From Swiss-Prot:
<dbReference type="InterPro" id="IPR020568">
    <property type="entry name" value="Ribosomal_Su5_D2-typ_SF"/>
</dbReference>
<comment type="function">
    <text>With S4 and S12 plays an important role in translational accuracy.</text>
</comment>
<dbReference type="GO" id="GO:0006412">
    <property type="term" value="P:translation"/>
</dbReference>
<dbReference type="InterPro" id="IPR014721">
    <property type="entry name" value="Ribsml_uS5_D2-typ_fold_subgr"/>
</dbReference>
<dbReference type="InterPro" id="IPR005324">
    <property type="entry name" value="Ribosomal_uS5_C"/>
</dbReference>
<feature type="domain" description="S5 DRBM">
    <location>
        <begin position="11"/>
        <end position="74"/>
    </location>
</feature>
<dbReference type="InterPro" id="IPR005712">
    <property type="entry name" value="Ribosomal_uS5_bac-type"/>
</dbReference>
<protein>
    <recommendedName>
        <fullName>Small ribosomal subunit protein uS5</fullName>
    </recommendedName>
</protein>
<dbReference type="GO" id="GO:0019843">
    <property type="term" value="F:rRNA binding"/>
</dbReference>
<comment type="subunit">
    <text>Part of the 30S ribosomal subunit. Contacts proteins S4 and S8.</text>
</comment>
<keyword id="KW-0699">rRNA-binding</keyword>
<dbReference type="Pfam" id="PF03719">
    <property type="entry name" value="Ribosomal_S5_C"/>
</dbReference>
<dbReference type="GO" id="GO:0015935">
    <property type="term" value="C:small ribosomal subunit"/>
</dbReference>
<dbReference type="Pfam" id="PF00333">
    <property type="entry name" value="Ribosomal_S5"/>
</dbReference>
<dbReference type="InterPro" id="IPR000851">
    <property type="entry name" value="Ribosomal_uS5"/>
</dbReference>
<dbReference type="InterPro" id="IPR013810">
    <property type="entry name" value="Ribosomal_uS5_N"/>
</dbReference>
<keyword id="KW-0694">RNA-binding</keyword>
Amino acid sequence: MASIEKQTGELQEKLIAVNRVSKTVKGGRIMSFTALTVVGDGNGRVGFGYGKAREVPAAIQKAMEKARRNMITVALNEGTLQHPIKGSHTGSRVFMQPASEGTGIIAGGAMRAVLEVAGVRNVLSKAYGSTNPINVVRATIDALANMKSPEMVAAKRGKTVDEILG
């Protein structure tokens, strides 16, 4: 598992995994590489990309471009989550809950990289089922995308934020 961090302007880029894959043809095997990356601004915007090419740098570059194109905005609450959330993709399931200041990012592998570039500073999380990095990243992004801020909930219910928060 490779992990490379790079700053581009205001975006943080992280390489999560590089994998060698092969295609079998009549004349033998054709080797190529895949790269899984996440990009975020550290302030609630995050995206992931998956690139494939004959050379590692080209695969990483493709993955970074896809990640920049597929960014979502996450409503954070002072460096943590709004409420406990669950996400899933194929065999991977993730559970994340807000944590108090000073807790840090308690997450493993691919999930940690996504949370770091998204700007989450305090969170408790657990991955269940498959720990395949691609599926864990997709499940984490799914959970973050489905998180609702109190303002969004209040608008849907036609109430004020104070009524929602109690």
